[in-house]
Amino acid sequence: MSSSFGKIFRVSTFGESHGGAVGVILDGCPPKLKVDINLIQNELDRRRPGQSDITTPRNEEDKIEILSGIKEGFTLGTPIAMLVRNKDQRPGDYDNLEQVFRPSHADGTYHLKYGIQASSGGGRASARETIGRVAAGAVAKQLLKTFCNTEILSWVKRIHDIESDINKEKISLKQIDSNIVRCPDEKVSTEMIERIKELKRQGDSCGGVIECLVRNVPSGLGMPVFDKLEADLAKALMSLPATKGFEIGSGFSGTYLKGSEHNDAFIKSDDISKLRTTSNNSGGIQGGISNGENIEMKIAFKPTATIGKEQKTVNAEGKEVLMKAKGRHDPCVLPRAVPMVDAMVALVLADHLLLNHAQCDLINK
């Protein structure tokens, strides 16, 4: 079971949804990096449960504890251990599911592979595991901001069949966090919230799409063939719970264009290190390497699998049973998934930034 990610900037998460705590060990972070603990807490607050009436009612404070690696606001270059204690577990909600495979959950596949079933809150398959990723991602964000002024912004673009079409170049974090669904389009966000509430009343759920924009990306991040930047971003984002699709740049819509329409022409420049393009269908990455343009991505999330409707399924003996979930769950994961997307993008970019310096700093380019 893999719980680690990254080559130089490495994270290992631990803990279960209804265990004593969840957390992360972050190794490979450079020393003397100024880290604001409040910014880490702010990211955790953005993903915590119980923050609004369109999220799960599970009530967790998610207060971060720094156990090692940071002293007086600066990193030591040693492993950074961060912990969040679980305080509102209700494993009894899952007693009736002990030997039942919930539709579209990890129960069945975990049983097939490991011979065990983490029915209580989903165990490691729960989105609660992402607390460690978000905490480590908050450190990665500060590293990227300090050395590159890089800004990562993610927002909800679509909920069910309700979609926003806002000018992404002008989007700010303040706009994104101005409402509980985290869509910077004021009119559309109201419609999204009402749709989620409607489905919640029906005991149902919905999915959607999160869009991510990364500004001030250094050129040269990523490597050819197996360590392409977009490949690592895809793996990172598709490792998040409930993800079902990834696009970068023009994505699937680019297949409708001709080469003459899709190509991003370079602009004449006296400084080749600041090369720019007339368009950005590539999404800021060409040949697996960042070109200095904004990185633009979309990530698809499926409807929450746990719903309040009675469903047919089978138990561990293969017999058909009826089940109805009792646990506390999000009717839509997207509002809380926004900081998770930010975190995974930050972790990939921080890792590639350090890899690039390790490989190329001695080269006279």
Swiss-Prot record:
Reaction(s) catalysed (UniProt annotation): 5-O-(1-carboxyvinyl)-3-phosphoshikimate = chorismate + phosphate
- Keyword Amino-acid biosynthesis listed: yes
In its keyword annotation, does this UniProt entry include Isomerase? no
> Per the UniProt record, which EC number(s) apply here?
4.2.3.5
- Cite the binding residues for NADP(+): R47
The pathway noted for it is: Metabolic intermediate biosynthesis; chorismate biosynthesis; chorismate from D-erythrose 4-phosphate and phosphoenolpyruvate: step 7/7
List cofactor names only.
Answer: FMNH2
Query: One GO CC annotation, please?
Result: cytosol
NCBIfam families in the record? aroC (TIGR00033), PRK05382.1 (NF003793)
Q: Which HAMAP family match?
A: Chorismate_synth
Question: Record's family?
Answer: Belongs to the chorismate synthase family.
Q: What is the name attached to this protein's record? A: Chorismate synthase
Lineage of producing organism: Bacteria, Bacillati, Cyanobacteriota, Cyanophyceae, Synechococcales
